[in-house]
A protein has these predicted regions:
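Beta-strand-rich interaction surfaces with strong enrichment in secreted/lumenal proteins
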Residues: 10, 21-24, 108-110, 121-126, ...
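Short strand-edge motifs at loop-to-beta-strand transitions and within beta-strands
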Residues: 116-120, 132
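Extended, low-hydrophobicity, Ser/Thr/Pro/Gly-biased non-transmembrane segments
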Residues: 75-100, 104, 111, 137-187
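Ligand-binding face of N-terminal immunoglobulin V-set domains in extracellular IgSF glycoproteins
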Residues: 30-59, 64, 73-81
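A short, structured loop/turn motif at beta-sheet edges
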Residues: 27-29, 43-48, 104-107, 124-133
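Short, hydrophobic/aromatic-enriched beta-strand segments in well-ordered soluble domains
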Residues: 36-38, 42, 55-57, 130-144
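N-terminal, polar/Ser/Thr-rich
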Residues: 1-33
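Outer-membrane beta-barrel and related beta-rich outer-membrane complex signature
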Residues: 63-69, 148-150
Length: 187
């Protein structure tokens, strides 16, 4: 579908995902809870037997690839205070998506959780031009940004107030492209 230049060719297509999201930030527990409806339309010429969602917050699970492969000393010959602070925080933090519920058109979905992604197996192939509606409920605790240095979390101040930083915070459809298929590499 693409010429040698890499630009889209004459048969280019692009998938469509429309989101309706409701979110609640609980300042006291430093957590968020959300529900969303994703209407996903298959504009590719292929029949899809499954779709993938990105669950970026699962990077903070104790058994995530990131945590299992990261040397806690940061790869240095010595350990600094910020590295010890991160390790101490992560040792007691219960991270990742909690209470994850996924339905397709109102029916519990058959899923395979794979780290920072989840594969949603469809009961029938999703043909070109067809849409499905995914209903997703979820919650997770926020990390302390000063300890973990993440794109998502909270920062506390001496006066007792917090600033909340939210990026990559909701389950979202993984890219499905004409040149790579599903972009489901672990985050």
């Amino acid at each position: 579908n693409r010429p040698a230049t890499g630009e889209p060719g004459p048969n280019y297509w692009q998938q469509r995902a429309d989101y309706k999201i409701k979110i609640k930030l609980d300042e006291a527990s430093r957590s968020i809870q959300g529900s969303e409806v994703i209407t996903y339309t298959n504009n590719s010429p292929l029949k899809l037997n499954y779709v993938w969602l990105q669950l970026d917050q699962n990077i903070f699970e104790k058994d995530s690839i990131n945590n299992l492969t990261r040397p806690w000393w940061g790869g240095n010959n010595s350990v600094d205070f910020s590295t010890l602070r991160r390790q101490n925080f992560m040792d007691t933090f219960d991270g990742g998506f909690q209470e994850l519920s996924i339905k397709i058109n109102g029916k519990d979905a058959r899923v395979n959780l794979v780290g920072t992604h989840v594969r949603i197996n469809l009961d029938a192939p999703l043909n070109n031009g067809e849409s499905i509606e995914l209903e997703i409920d979820w919650a997770y605790a926020l990390v302390e940004e000063n300890a973990v240095r993440a794109r998502n979390g909270y920062e506390s101040f001496e006066d007792g107030n917090d600033i909340f930083l939210l990026a990559q915070w909701y389950p979202r459809i993984t890219v499905f492209s004409d040149y790579e298929g599903w972009h489901n590499k672990e985050f």
